[in-house]
Amino acid sequence: MAVDTSGTRISANGKSADLSVRISEGPKYSLGAITFAGHPGMERKELIEALALKDRAPFTPYAVDEMQRTLRSFYRSKGFFNAKIEVLADRTRARDGSVPVTFVCEPGPRFRIGSVVARGTDRLSPAFMEKRFESLTGKTYDPATLETRYREMIKTGLFKTLHVRPVQDGPDTLKLDVEIEEAKAKEIGFELGYGTYDGVSAGVRVGDRNFLRNGRPLSLSLQYSQRGFRGELLYVDPWIFDSEWMLRAKIYSALRDEIGYSKTTEGLRLGLSRKFTPHWEAGAYVVGETTDISALKIDSRLVGPTSYVLTAAGLMQTFDYRNDVSNPTRGWVLMTSADLDALDGRLAFARATVRYSWYRAFGKSLLGLGARAGWIIPIGDAEVPIDLRFFNGGSTTVRSFSEMKLGPKDAKGNPLGGEFYTVLNAEWDFPIKGALGGAVFTDAGNLRGSSDVSLDDMRYGVGVGLRYQLPIGPVRIDYGYNPARKAGDSSGAFHLSFGFAF
């Protein structure tokens, strides 16, 4: 290509100019035959696939440089840390506009991770960082695996800065030079909110992300709402016994006033989980809990056990392909769980739940679809306590009903819950101005007994809402209209809540 600006003319007063630009495009070149010279050490097909070239792709100096970088990164991903790639491309050798390109590949030795050296630890135990990268030692160098481990460490919140540099430490060995600056480990946080069902709420959380200098978080949280009080002590070990498994141990106590009764609960929950892939997490849990139900406004014959000990064990798994956990704009998540309580003959049941959510952005608008179901199966003559039953209706289920108001009720209108439920949601969110957005939605769901599992007696809701976007999720105001009211139903319900409905 040639550019000619000789036609430029300056005005008589010298304050302006007429600029004439003549462009001669010249011949058009495309990428021609690709060859590999030197000592590639890999099959040609594998190298071509790594380049991911399109047919008759344009030939430009930038395109050639990008191909060189891509090939070098590919070799490094296979452990060839010092791979050298030279490009030979000469337009004078072009035939019919196609320029042949030769890559001279000298991968060198395949490197493995050797030692890990951490610098900058203060409150953290010096061995902490070495143990976090220990599983990589002795293995072939892989930048992607190293990046994943780096991101895992950043998410702990333990570091103000973290740099991980592979440094050659022998003919085929790399040393990981880890340089850190620790963040403040101790924290205190406060929260204040309001929800349609819980009313005004407030809370305080005190935590130490570096408990006993081992990088494990311990926190105490106290929460109050107009429905009651809850205290919780939580210990998390993301690497129990320095493995890939995570332990969550929680001790809690709560006092709540529900519709038709009050309850006090003390319990312990232990959960063990592991991420087997970046998108699949699975685990198991056990729960021990004592509960006392009091201040009954419901006939005791409809409530089930009012004082019991829950001892349950269960399995869970999550497939999460969302692009953002708190504010997704694409992807889907599937969560399932199943547990069993059969140690106490008065309280014996099996329970299973499933939840699926899908998100897709269309420009600045967002379509969300959701489906949920749960089933509790009593064992023998056991009754399910009212507080362990499923409920439906509210800000995250069928929004044409107030909280827990969909389903069986006693003569006074108190919800009784059920052993099988479904919820289906569809919502379209759209921008209005700035952080303010709107929504239209439709919901459906039902609530039935354990022996009457079906999609009969579905209840529906259609509605509109407002959304105010925050970095951690939206504040929601919704009104759901009931298009098929039955005796005792209200025409609809307002909801004020935080986060996504499903």
Regions found by a protein language model. Give the residues of each.
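Periplasmic polypeptide-binding modules associated with outer-membrane biogenesis and secretion
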Residues: M1-T196, R205, S219-D237, K263, ...
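Transmembrane beta-strand segments that form the barrel wall of outer-membrane beta-barrel proteins
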Residues: F133, A185-T196, A202-N210, N214-S225, ...
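Outer-membrane beta-barrel "beta-signal"
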Residues: V206, G314-L315, V464-L470, P474-V475, ...
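Solvent-exposed loop/turn segments connecting transmembrane beta-strands
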Residues: G170, Y194-S201, L220-G231, R256-K263, ...
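Residues that define the transmembrane beta-barrel architecture of outer-membrane proteins
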Residues: M67, D198-V200, R227-F229, S262-E266, ...
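Repeated loop/turn-to-beta-strand initiation elements of outer-membrane beta-barrel proteins
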Residues: K160, K186-I188, G199, F211-L218, ...
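Transmembrane beta-barrel wall of Gram-negative outer-membrane proteins
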Residues: G231-S307
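C-terminal outer-membrane beta-barrel translocator/porin domains of Gram-negative envelope proteins
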Residues: K155, E187-F190, Y285-V287, S294-A435, ...
